Design a protein with these regions (language model features):
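Glycine-rich, mobile lid/loop segments that gate access to catalytic sites or pores
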Residues: 1-90
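Short, mixed-charge aromatic SLiMs
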Residues: 6-17, 124-127, 234-239
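Predominant activation on well-ordered alpha-helical scaffold segments within soluble catalytic domains
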Residues: 55-58, 96-103, 211-213, 254-267
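Compositionally biased, intrinsically disordered low-complexity segments enriched
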Residues: 135-169
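Internal helix-turn-beta structural module
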Residues: 219-274
């Protein structure tokens, strides 16, 4: 599910994707529920978690429209229910495929997963997501993250390309299946205390929510007179664009980001079944 995270300098509440404690899970669950309820009750308003943020964003866009200008923003999308082991450690990684799809959306200028650029300010001891065994397996399941009950559904399947297990095996599929059977008894109890990586490690899903943030640029077609060049005369020229202009396309791109993430993950799930 996606929401408008920011328009210009106006920010909505961010998804609580990183805290995987019982409290953090409940916060994310409540955010998703609130977002769904607001979207159904107010389909013509901006898709935000915080109603006040939607009002402030709308006013910000109106200001840009009156100035014959445009604004950009960011969109956050969290994908719950993604099983562990989807993707690969090289060019077919989950992040690779998602980024490729998301950059195919016009006006997308940035894509980051998990903490993204925020990870550059963290130490490894802060960013690394610690694993543990759940004291109570039932606590790892909630409706906001359907796969927590199957959290590392085949934890070793995520390591199916591990040379230590496949090096002398001529049937990698059988090897992966054997690892699944061996790990099934205990893998369901493995949980992550945090999710700074955004649900993907080494290109492979961890079973935690996949979190991605997308940056949308301001629309270039604006009412202002802009400096350009005349290639016929080889001289500077003024560019005037007439007609109606979108002051902001972020709200409309929100559902596109959500759809692209869903299609990409579904494609990868189908590939896993082949």
């Amino acid at each position: 599910m996606a929401h408008v995270a920011s328009i210009g300098t106006i920010h909505d509440d961010t998804f609580a994707f990183a805290d995987r404690s019982k409290h953090g899970r409940s916060v994310l669950k409540a955010q998703l529920q609130t977002l769904e309820e607001r979207t159904c009750a107010h389909p013509h308003e901006l898709c935000t978690i915080n109603a006040d943020a939607a009002q402030a964003m709308s006013a910000y866009i109106d200001d840009a429209r009156r100035d014959a200008d445009s604004v950009g923003g960011t969109i956050e999308c969290v994908c719950t229910g993604v099983p562990a082991g989807i993707g690969s450690g090289m060019f077919g990684g989950l992040e690779n495929k998602l980024a490729c799809a998301l950059f195919g959306i016009p006006a997308v200028k940035a894509v980051e997963f998990g903490e993204g650029f925020g990870a550059c300010l963290m130490r490894g001891s802060e960013h690394n997501d610690q694993m543990t065994y759940a004291a109570d397996t039932s606590d790892t399941s909630d409706t906001s993250d359907a796969t927590d009950a199957t959290d590392a559904t085949n934890a070793a399947a995520a390591n199916a390309h591990d040379t230590s297990t496949c090096e002398n095996n001529t049937n990698p599929q059988a090897d992966a299946e054997r690892w699944r059977r061996r790990s099934d008894a205990h893998a369901r109890d493995v949980i992550f205390e945090t999710n700074h990586a955004g649900g993907v490690l080494g290109g492979i899903s961890t079973g935690e929510p996949v979190f991605v943030r997308v940056g949308i640029k301001p629309t270039p077609s604006i009412g202002h007179v802009q400096q350009s060049v005349d290639i016929a005369t080889k001289q500077p020229a003024l560019l005037r664009i007439s007609g109606r202009h979108d002051p902001c396309i972020v709200p409309r791109a929100c559902v596109v980001v959500e759809a692209m993430c869903a299609f990409t993950i579904m494609d990868m799930l189908l590939d896993e079944q082949q």
